[in-house]
Amino acid sequence: MLRRQMQLDFSGIKTYSAEDRHNLVTIDNMMTPGVTPHEEYKYEGFDELVERIVKARKNGRPVIWSMGAHVVKNRLSRYVIELMKMGVITHIAANGATSIHDFELAYLGGTSEDVPTAIEDGSFGMWEQTGAWMNEAIQRGAKLNIGYGEALGEYIDMHPEKFPNREDCILWNAYKLDIPATYHIALGTDIIHQHPTCDMEAIGKCSGIDF
């Protein structure tokens, strides 16, 4: 059956090296538990939330940490990693953007491009390493019938030479600690979906396995 509507060809898309990009978040300005000074967090219900988490873990119950990318963009990755290492967090659940910022920190030591400038000059999201490596990892994961998070964590673990900053990567730490890290993807919403090597079937399969 012939396709009625023309499909866009991504093969001619031009990408840029992320090494040349200015990043708003770097491993040098990340916050560190017990080191970085901060104001006391005051929010109604926060103390109760903490108490419930502590109670849950004391009773052997899981704590599923559901988050978006701004946890990473606000330089808080090390706090999440510390909570995993302490045995507080037993499951990471996040969206695609979270995995991208986390992945970029691992290989580049920085993430969060200057969006207004990047949109203006047409470079937004067109980063070769991020798109190529993440899609490579995901497609490998699809062939192995493993989830999105495990596929990325295993890829980072297999290529230490590419990821000198992986100690600050949430998904890699989850992989090493044998904590599930699941990523729940909306197709077409992440920058790696516009990369020439993107395989939507592989992304859907791996994210579906995570679900």
Listing of model-derived features with the role each one plays in the protein:
Residues 1-129, 133-143, 150-211:
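Metallocofactor- and cofactor-centric catalytic cores in central/energy metabolism, strongly enriched
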